A protein has these predicted regions:
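Binding-site signature for planar aromatic cofactors or substrates
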Residues: 1-214
Length: 214
């Protein structure tokens, strides 16, 4: 352990696996053995039913990024047990994840299914494909994605339900009134101090949501 100070508080920080194992112990045999090197039928079925995933990448220097991806269930296509495709739909053109993959192919995915507390974790190597028959095949409403992320699967396993059960994610227990959270236009106005009025920002955002989904 290493002694450090965080926000004026003296703390001990783990520096190795040995430090962590001294606190957590070893995983169970089931937890160790559940990691697969391919997408079996259960993983493929989970992906087919999932309308949402979180996509994790990092650049060449290790700066991490996490991006949400969502569409109708089945929007992620499984080509075989080792390969899946994620279409890149219209966004704001920051393309953080795509830029990261050009210098560091390592990628992590977390698939969710509404109403199911377990999640699916997939890790592997990603490539940004800009020309292939897949792009046309993954078009929606006549709109073709400009690229597809092809993932070579190295690891896949189901995550237990504890996190989603604790958060009660699929129930209304912690649901907030939308009016209790500032609009995106208001937040951007406060954060970057732009001259555009909040109402105009919100209107532009809603127009983008309506006209630029695909």
């Amino acid at each position: 352990m290493k002694l450090e100070t965080i926000c004026g508080v003296d703390v001990e920080v783990a520096q190795s696996e040995a430090d962590l194992r001294a606190i957590y112990g070893q995983p169970s045999e089931l937890a160790r053995r559940k990691s697969l090197t391919r997408l079996d039928r259960h993983c493929q079925d989970f992906i087919a039913k999932s309308p949402f995933l979180c996509l994790s990448t990092a650049n060449a220097t290790g700066d991490a990024d996490l991006s949400p991806r969502g569409d109708a269930p089945g929007f992620v296509r499984v080509l075989d047990e080792q390969t899946l495709l994620i279409p890149d739909r219209l966004g704001n053109n920051r393309i953080d994840s795509l830029l990261n993959l050009t210098t560091n192919p390592h990628i992590g995915l977390l698939f969710l299914i509404p109403g199911v507390d377990e999640t699916l974790r997939v890790n592997g190597l990603g490539q940004v494909v800009t020309a292939a028959p897949w792009l046309e095949e993954m078009a929606v409403n006549g709109k073709t994605p400009r690229s597809v992320i092809a993932v070579q699967v190295r690891e896949a396993f189901l995550q237990c339900a504890k996190a989603l059960k604790r958060s009660r994610l699929w129930s209304n227990d912690y649901r907030v009134d939308r009016q209790d959270v500032p609009s995106l236009g208001q937040i951007l106005f406060d954060q970057i101090g732009c001259a555009t009025p909040v109402a105009e920002l919100d209107a532009a955002i809603e127009t983008s949501y309506r006209d630029r989904m695909y």
